[in-house]
Amino acid sequence: MKRALLFAAAACCLAPVALAGGAPGVTSSTITIGGTVPITGPAALFGSVGRGADAYFKYVNAHGGVNGRKIKYVYLDDAYDPSKTVQLTRQLVEQNHVLAIFNTVGTDNNLAIRDYLNTAKIPQLFGGTGAAKIGDDFKGHPWTMGFLPSFRAEGVIYGRSIAATASPKVAVLYEDSDFGKDLTAGLKKGLGAKAGSIVAEQAYQPTDTSIDSQMSSLHASGANVLVLNVTPQYAILAYLAAHKFGWHPKIYVSSVCISPNVMDIVRANAAQEASGSLSIAFVKDPTDKVWAKDPVVALYRSILKRFAPSAKPEDVYNFYGMGVAFTMVDALAHAGKSPTRASLLKAATHLNEVNPFMRPGITIVTTPTDYYPISRAQLVRYDRSHWVAAAPLASARG
């Protein structure tokens, strides 16, 4: 067991050294990083990504840290409100003096802070977004990098899957944001010659408390395929609405919604509609018996038990948080024995990593002109209570 617990840290933690600090956030014994996550508010389900990352950093610290320094991760609740993200990010930079901003959740949230951080030349790394405005803008905002697969590429995967079926009539519900628009643009690209099979589109605002009118319009379109380019709260509402209408289309749901703590609610209230749903996956599912003997899943459970005992192991956002933290530790390790903001950015843009939290065959690769770390993803189908592979790995590049 001890070897299993150590293997991930051994891959990314180097021998201790005794050097004085110099860069902001770096002392002889610590590296301070920070970010915001929605612990409350409409996207509170995502809050676990901060807790999972924090638990992983504590595990790394318990095994020597990175180049002899312990990681201090300060994550604050922005309630998914970009204005709060700005306020709290300034606090992290100007009061906590962080080396870098890490793991900020949300596309609009990341966009709200990138000008400030790029002007100050502060790394904004591995944010919870796959938006083209961030991934494609490595020249205009070189200090900003997301972590999720390209939303556009995710949409392309769905479009190609739908295009391979006979006589699709497609209805689309999407968030009126770069997240939802990128997914929908990718969907249309993937549909190719069948882009005309989209018979209805409806948008919602991230602050909406109901999507009944949108779902009613989509239902009335007669579509036999429903694409949900949405966040978890609205995925649940959409499934419940389809169930209420007695509407049973083939459903594609965005990858940010596939955690068991989302789909268990859907399955309990709209089992027929949930069955056979399609999405993409890139991290392992620690609740799936397929991974029951996987060493990193065992590591994940042991880390939560020791460093976040109140966390639920079945919450996949905890697992994702550890996965993104693994990559951050790798970047910090390669930033040198005396890391600076510039050396950390260089390390983050030269990754070639096998991240054990990812599904087999998915690597973390970046270059100064490729800011989409996750290389591939897999189309998966919801079968009773778990997601199973529905197709080979596909490109997740922008």
Residue ranges and their predicted role:
Residues 20-35, 65-70, 163-168, 338:
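Immediate post-signal peptide segment of exported/extracytoplasmic ligand-binding proteins
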Residues 306-318, 327-387:
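Segments of small-molecule ligand-sensing domains
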